[in-house]
UniProtKB/Swiss-Prot annotation:
Biological function: Binds to sialic acid-containing receptors on the cell surface, bringing about the attachment of the virus particle to the cell. This attachment induces virion internalization of about two third of the virus particles through clathrin-dependent endocytosis and about one third through a clathrin- and caveolin-independent pathway. Plays a major role in the determination of host range restriction and virulence. Class I viral fusion protein. Binds to sialic acid-containing receptors on the cell surface, bringing about the attachment of the virus particle to the cell. This attachment induces virion internalization either through clathrin-dependent endocytosis or through clathrin- and caveolin-independent pathway. Plays a major role in the determination of host range restriction and virulence. Class I viral fusion protein. Responsible for penetration of the virus into the cell cytoplasm by mediating the fusion of the membrane of the endocytosed virus particle with the endosomal membrane.
Organism: Influenza A virus (strain A/Equine/New Market/1/1977 H7N7)
GO CC entries: host cell plasma membrane; membrane; viral envelope; virion membrane
InterPro entries: Capsid_hemagglutn, Hemagglutn_HA1_a/b_dom_sf, Hemagglutn_influenz_A, Hemagglutn_influenz_A/B
Cell location: Virion membrane; Host apical cell membrane
Pfam family, one: Hemagglutinin
This protein's name: Hemagglutinin
Length: 570
């Protein structure tokens, strides 16, 4: 009897074997590992690098109005030492300073030098206007062998005012200049510190010297400090240069009685530019927007690990050499063990025994889309990509890199460490600030990429679930989920039927009657098969009970007829 039940169950199951459709996603044999907020080293199908490490060892100047200052220092363009004669006025949007460049000829320095350098780097070039100063009672042709052209000369944009005669009296003078332009004027003047008191008397006469400069926003007095200093360029004296930005319609006044280096022309800034200190060669055949001392960074990535002091439209500098941004779904490739198992199970169970747990295991053969279907029916087996869900995921992931760039993009300026003794403390603060910013942005970069990676993986999983739910809602009671991403269909589903499921045009009512009949038959088989062991044990128990009952009846009859005697001893 039990054997008959088992044979009937197997026969019924073979007769009603269901067609099947499964859902899966794309996988590759070798994915890329990324980090998320919750886990490090997650393997994804696609990822892109966000940290640029490739440097172009040239200054790419194509499309730029570039000026290469050569031996002229940028500050020198405002006062005019001989090496800067050709750059007294210029227009540029890319200014290149060289290591060999020098701002001065007569030894000295600029006050607040680095701030002025930053202003000029962004200036777009400079133009000049004569300030209209005239002098009587003094000489205006002071010159020095430190500033040689064909012979001794002086700064082209400055006047070295001297007494009419050696040791002669230098008169008290006042000069004024009003800025009538619509943009600020850069005004530069100098204070001459003679190599000795005797030299100062010879040049400007005896007595204390005082220079006072004032405008509506500025007032400062200067006294020269004569005395011996180490010789530079054959000179023991020094000239210190000072400057101010004079607003439109404002007036600057100079009151002096010697030791004054007077401005001859005011400088005006032309527009906007980038300035970079570099000895890299100019290349007019490549374009760039981000520069550093070693060349050009050409990149569309949000971060770079090349130089922390790059300027222009640059990726953010971070300490990490690599930060991978996920642009595809989580990847679990079919390894060799899995492929062997797949082959074995196909022989044993067909195509769909190989893709159990489809959400954890992708299909390496699904190359036309990120998501897709595999089916098995009387006509054979097939695989097809689902373009709608793929496109939905792609649309949301496309532009992730650009959005990351928007969050991090900024125009950078270069602040060098060329500070004088008074400014060294400021320089230390700037360096500390720069290091702190790098630390912050290195952390921010890692966090931003991890957030985006988390979102990408969650997004692609969500699209997979949406696709699965779409199929489940269509099939309804006409199919049963097997828990492995597949649906066993309780009716004959040919290729057109499978296509209607994929296209979301499946009509479950059309197949409902056939599906219900097959479901009842299959459920009955499953029920019989499921209770097989219970029936066997029940039959065994009933047989044992029947055997004991017969034995007891026979014993009773024998005792009654005297054929058997039972003696009980106490």
């Amino acid at each position: 009897m039990n054997t008959q039940i088992l044979i009937l169950a197997i026969s019924a199951f073979l007769c009603v074997r269901a067609d099947k459709i499964c859902l899966g996603h794309h996988a590759v044999s070798n994915g890329t590992k990324v980090d998320t907020l919750t886990e490090k080293g997650i393997e994804v199908v696609n990822a892109t690098e966000t940290v640029e490490q490739k440097n172009i060892p040239k200054i790419c100047s194509k499309g730029k109005q570039t000026i290469d200052l050569g031996q002229c220092g940028l500050l020198g363009t405002t006062i005019g030492p001989p090496q800067c004669d050709q750059f007294l006025e210029f227009s540029a949007n890319l200014i290149i300073e060289r290591r060999e460049g020098d701002d001065i000829c007569y030894p000295g320095k600029f006050d607040n030098e680095e701030t002025l350098r930053q202003i000029l780097r962004k200036s777009g070039g400079i133009k000049k206007e004569n300030m209209g100063f005239t002098y009587t009672g003094v000489r205006t042709n002071g010159e020095t062998s430190a500033c040689r052209r064909s012979r001794s000369s002086f700064y082209a944009e400055m006047k070295w005012l001297l007494s009419n005669t050696d040791n002669g009296v230098f008169p008290q003078m006042t000069k004024s200049y009003k800025n009538t332009k619509k943009e600020p004027a850069l005004i530069i003047w100098g204070i001459h510190h003679s190599g000795s008191t005797a030299e100062q008397t010879r040049l400007y006469g005896s007595g204390n010297k005082l220079i006072t400069v004032w405008s509506s926003k500025y007032q400062q007095s200067f006294a020269p400090n004569p005395g011996p200093r180490p010789q530079m360029n054959g000179q023991s004296g020094r000239i210190d240069f000072y400057w101010l930005m004079l607003d439109p319609n404002d007036t600057v006044n100079f009151s002096f009685n010697g030791a004054f280096i007077a401005p001859d022309r005011a400088s005006f800034l032309r527009g906007k530019s980038l300035g970079i200190q570099s000895d890299a060669q100019l290349d007019n055949n490549c374009e760039g927007e981000c520069y550093h001392i070693g060349g050009t960074i050409i990149s569309n990535l949000p971060f770079q690990n090349i130089n922390s002091r790059a300027i222009g439209k640059c990726p953010r500098y971070v300490k990490q050499k690599s930060l991978m941004l996920a642009t595809g779904m989580k990847n679990v490739p079919e390894n060799s063990t899995h492929k062997q198992l797949t082959h074995h199970m196909r022989k044993k169970r067909g195509l769909f025994g190989a893709i159990a747990g489809f959400i954890e295991n992708g299909w390496e053969g699904l190359i036309d889309g990120w998501y897709g279907y595999r089916h098995q029916n009387a006509q054979g087996e097939g695989t097809a990509a689902d373009y709608k869900s793929t496109q939905s995921a792609v649309n949301q992931i496309t532009g992730k890199l650009n959005r990351l760039i928007e969050k991090t993009n900024q125009q950078f300026e270069l602040i060098d460490n060329e500070f004088n003794e008074i400014e060294k403390q400021i320089g230390n603060v700037i360096n500390w600030t720069r290091d702190s910013i790098i630390e912050i942005w290195s952390y921010n970069a890692e966090f931003l990429v991890a957030v985006e990676n988390q979102h990408t993986i969650d997004l692609t999983d969500s699209e997979m679930n949406k696709l699965y739910e779409k199929v489940r809602r269509q099939l309804r009671e006409n199919a049963e989920e097997d828990g492995n991403g597949c649906f066993e269909i309780f009716h004959q589903c040919d290729n057109d039927c499978m296509a209607s499921i994929r296209n979301n045009t499946y009509d479950h009512k059309k197949y409902r009657k056939e599906a219900i009949q097959n479901r009842i038959q299959i459920d009955a088989v499953k029920l019989s098969s499921g209770y097989k062991e219970i029936i066997l044990w029940f039959s065994f128990g009933a047989s044992c009970f029947l055997f004991l009952a017969i034995a007891m009846v026979l014993a009773f009859i024998c005792i009654k007829n005297g054929n058997m005697r039972c003696t009980i001893c106490i």
